[in-house]
């Protein structure tokens, strides 16, 4: 529905979701969606090829939902992917898509309270597959209290030839001298 334009969204914790369109340097508000059932919306990601929009909601509910993006740029067909009665053990936060083909791949959700990442099928009904955590090695400390994730699954540079995973780490632990939150950059090869 965006006809080759770039799009972005804003998710307000207890309010609406805004859909924006970028054309060169111009930014236009296309639509605002009422996310009335959300207690505290956190992360979001578009799946362009499958016309899906995913939102995570933390605190009381701990839910990940998918919506279909219609040709009129409306969010429709709300579907509950997972919640704390299922496979979510902390607050669902960041969301990212790992594409394995045009329409297939995985939805990855970071969980702040449990410092884990859940893997779901990219296609409806978004079946839970597994979870993982990022452990300490000779280069980094364990990722804890994570609030976000992003994945690029194509050549990034010689250090990340098959792609890169960027995760927010709430605090440094172990022998690290920097105690503040930071970002970890990991090779996509480590997830395969």
Regions found by a protein language model. Name each.
Residues 5, 42-50, 93-103, 148-160:
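Structural signature of eukaryotic scaffold interfaces centered on beta-propeller domains
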Residues 81-93, 127-155:
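Conserved blade-ending motifs and adjacent loop-strand segments that build the rim/top face
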Residues 13-14, 56-60, 111-112, 168-170:
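Short loop/turn segments immediately following the C-termini of beta-strands
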Residues 148-192:
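Blade-level signature of beta-propeller repeat domains, shared across WD40, Kelch, NHL, RCC1
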Residues 86-132:
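Loop/turn-rich, solvent-exposed surfaces of beta-rich toroidal or solenoidal domains
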Residues 1-8, 12:
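Single conserved hydrophobic/aromatic residue that forms the stacking wall/gate
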Residues 19-27, 66-74, 119-127, 186-192:
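Short loop/turn segments immediately following beta-strands, especially the blade-tip
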Residues 40-42, 60, 91, 113, ...:
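Beta-rich catalytic cores
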């Amino acid at each position: 529905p965006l006809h080759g334009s770039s799009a972005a969204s804003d998710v307000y914790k207890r309010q609406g979701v805004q859909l924006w369109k970028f054309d060169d340097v111009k930014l236009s508000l296309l639509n605002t969606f009422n996310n009335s059932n959300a207690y505290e919306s956190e992360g979001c990601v578009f799946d362009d090829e499958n016309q899906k929009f995913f939102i995570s909601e933390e605190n009381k509910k701990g839910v990940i939902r998918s919506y279909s993006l219609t040709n009129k740029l409306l969010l429709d067909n709300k579907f509950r992917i997972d919640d704390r009665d299922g496979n979510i053990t902390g607050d669902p936060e960041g969301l990212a898509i790992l594409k394995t083909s045009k329409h297939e791949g995985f939805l990855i959700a970071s969980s702040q309270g449990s410092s884990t990442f859940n893997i779901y099928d990219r296609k409806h009904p978004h079946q839970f597959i597994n979870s993982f955590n990022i452990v300490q090695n000779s280069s980094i400390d364990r990722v804890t209290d994570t609030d976000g994730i992003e994945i690029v699954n194509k050549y990034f540079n010689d250090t990340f030839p098959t792609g890169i995973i960027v995760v927010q780490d709430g605090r440094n632990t172990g022998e690290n001298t920097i105690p503040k939150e930071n970002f970890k950059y990991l090779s996509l090869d480590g997830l395969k």
